[in-house]
Amino acid sequence: MQDDPRYRVEVEVSPRFLAHQSTPEEGRYAFAYSIRIQNAGAVPARLIARHWKITDANGRTEQVDGEGVVGEQPRLRPGEAFHYTSGVLLETEQGQMQGYYDMVADDGTEFTAPIAAFVLSVPRTLH
């Protein structure tokens, strides 16, 4: 079902470093990421769950799974978008996140919306 154009959701991510919430001397680097989820398909669909793989610069990986996003399970009509912002703490100046959303269309079809890997980096540390 992943290749069926009726069931397509596009995800855009904008990460940023939160210097005021970070304490580098304690190995605490805070990042926010703003997400835009748009139903680019032809059928209304609801976001049911999220699945994240978070990797820091030391190769330490954490898997985060949960229902919905920011306490919601938004239903998106074709062309409609949902925006939210969340955050993550890393022990290193750099890392990355990637994952996917579990979706279910109004006709009962289940599918996933991939979230491409994106970089989390303290400014001026990316080489």
Swiss-Prot record:
One BP annotation, GO: error-free translesion synthesis
Coiled coil region boundaries: none
InterPro entries tied to this protein: ApaG_domain (IPR007474), ApaG_sf (IPR036767), Uncharacterised_ApaG (IPR023065)
Gene3D superfamilies (alphabetical): ApaG domain
Location of the ApaG domain: 3-127
HAMAP family: ApaG (MF_00791)
PANTHER family, per database record: F-BOX ONLY PROTEIN 3 (PTHR14289), POLYMERASE DELTA-INTERACTING PROTEIN 2 (PTHR14289:SF16)
Protein name as annotated: Protein ApaG
